[in-house]
């Protein structure tokens, strides 16, 4: 990526990075880093890890202050809707990450710049980059602008639920259900891993799902579990 493109992204984000290579790393998919080791740019998984934590802190703090009467369970549900892959995927297009994401040739040809997991992960990586380079206040300011109208209390109540949240709420209607997710399998090279996740209810494996990230695999597994439970009720 040339310097002009990186400056264009900085303008969209509203920040001049002290170390532009941090931003470059945030938009570098593992497949690209694997194909171009000569650039010496780290891929975005570590920044994604950092950004995930920063985003969760911001959303938790915001919801805690905005809804003083809501229970821990209700706050958790709202947070899940705000930070789920579907929500981050939508936000990625707001800052044109689909145009800036650096992908390996195979991943790009496979439509990787439109793939939910790639874009959702890149959003978290960008948040991590802003935090690491500019500090917590800058990161919180960026998240506020990124989410925009989504953070208005009246809009928060209308947020769509992801599959994991829907499954959790369904099981909570019946007492004593214990829900957990487990990564059952990791396949492929480091830059193109495929994960298989399992939905386990009361220590019983109910459904599995596959995806290019752990989150994506868990969402797919939850979706299949919901379909299975729905079919059982219709019988």
Swiss-Prot record:
Its EC number is 3.1.26.3. GO terms for molecular function: double-stranded RNA binding; metal ion binding; ribonuclease III activity; rRNA binding. GO terms for cellular component: cytoplasm. Residues 162-231 form the DRBM domain. This is Ribonuclease 3. It comes from Carboxydothermus hydrogenoformans (strain ATCC BAA-161 / DSM 6008 / Z-2901). Signal peptide: none annotated. Keywords: Cytoplasm, Endonuclease, Hydrolase, Magnesium, Metal-binding, mRNA processing, Nuclease, RNA-binding, rRNA processing, rRNA-binding, tRNA processing. Digests double-stranded RNA. Involved in the processing of primary rRNA transcript to yield the immediate precursors to the large and small rRNAs (23S and 16S). Processes some mRNAs, and tRNAs when they are encoded in the rRNA operon. Processes pre-crRNA and tracrRNA of type II CRISPR loci if present in the organism. The gene is rnc. Gene3D superfamilies: 3.30.160.20, Ribonuclease III domain. PANTHER family: RIBONUCLEASE 3, RIBONUCLEASE III. Pfam families: dsrm (PF00035), Ribonucleas_3_3 (PF14622). It is found in: Cytoplasm. It catalyses: Endonucleolytic cleavage to 5'-phosphomonoester. Belongs to the ribonuclease III family. Mg(2+) binds at residues 48, 121, 124. The keyword Plastid does not apply. Residues 6-135 form the RNase III domain.
């Amino acid at each position: 990526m040339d310097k002009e493109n990186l400056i264009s992204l900085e303008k969209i984000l509203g920040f001049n990075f002290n170390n532009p290579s941090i931003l470059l790393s945030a938009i570098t998919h593992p497949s690209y880093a694997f194909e171009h080791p000569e650039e010496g740019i780290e891929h975005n998984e570590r920044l994604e890890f950092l950004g995930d934590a920063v985003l969760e802190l911001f959303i938790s703090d915001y919801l805690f202050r905005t809804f003083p009467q809501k229970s821990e369970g209700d706050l958790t549900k709202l947070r899940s809707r705000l930070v789920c892959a579907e929500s981050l995927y939508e936000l990625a297009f707001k800052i044109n990450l689909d145009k800036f994401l650096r992908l390996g040739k195979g991943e790009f040809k496979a439509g990787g710049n439109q793939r939910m997991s790639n874009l959702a992960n890149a959003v978290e990586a960008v948040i991590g980059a802003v935090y690491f380079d500019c500090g917590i206040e800058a990161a919180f300011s960026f998240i506020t602008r990124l989410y925009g109208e989504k953070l208005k209390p009246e809009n928060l109540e209308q947020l769509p639920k992801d599959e994991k949240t829907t499954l959790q709420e369904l099981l909570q209607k019946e007492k004593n259900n214990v829900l957990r997710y487990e990564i059952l399998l990791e396949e492929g090279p480091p830059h193109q891993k495929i994960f298989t996740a399992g939905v386990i209810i009361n220590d019983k494996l109910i459904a599995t799902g596959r995806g290019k990230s752990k989150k994506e695999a868990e969402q797919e597994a939850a979706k299949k579990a919901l379909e299975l439970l729905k079919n059982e009720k219709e019988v």
